[in-house]
Amino acid sequence: MAKKGMVEREKKRQRLVAKYAHKRQALLEQISQASSQQERMDLHRQLQRLPRNSAPTRLRNRCWVTGRSRGYYRDFGLSRHVLREMAHEGLLPGVTKSSW
């Protein structure tokens, strides 16, 4: 299980990304449509002034049960360990053991 601080830090990043998403998108569109190099540099500086953790690339997928970041399955939002346990217990609808 991941440390609580890591999970909370990730939640904080998600809140910041959501908060600044519209402003960041608007600045990126303005940068792409800027006519002069000076205008583009000014807009880029404004983009750099936004909080670092508000960039979506800083997010890391984490299991919603354990907080584990590795072995993450997007379809379920779970790590491989929890996915296996829940599948064996029949808690995931549509997931069955393979047989061939």
Swiss-Prot record:
Quaternary context: Part of the 30S ribosomal subunit. Contacts proteins S3 and S10.
Recorded family membership: Belongs to the universal ribosomal protein uS14 family.
GO MF entries: rRNA binding; structural constituent of ribosome
Protein name in the entry: Small ribosomal subunit protein uS14
GO CC annotation, single: small ribosomal subunit
HAMAP family associated with the record: Ribosomal_uS14_1 (MF_00537)
Domain of life of the source: Bacteria
Functional summary from the UniProt entry: Binds 16S rRNA, required for the assembly of 30S particles and may also be responsible for determining the conformation of the 16S rRNA at the A site.
Gene Ontology biological-process entries: translation
Keywords linked to the UniProt accession: Ribonucleoprotein, Ribosomal protein, RNA-binding, rRNA-binding
Organism: Acaryochloris marina (strain MBIC 11017)
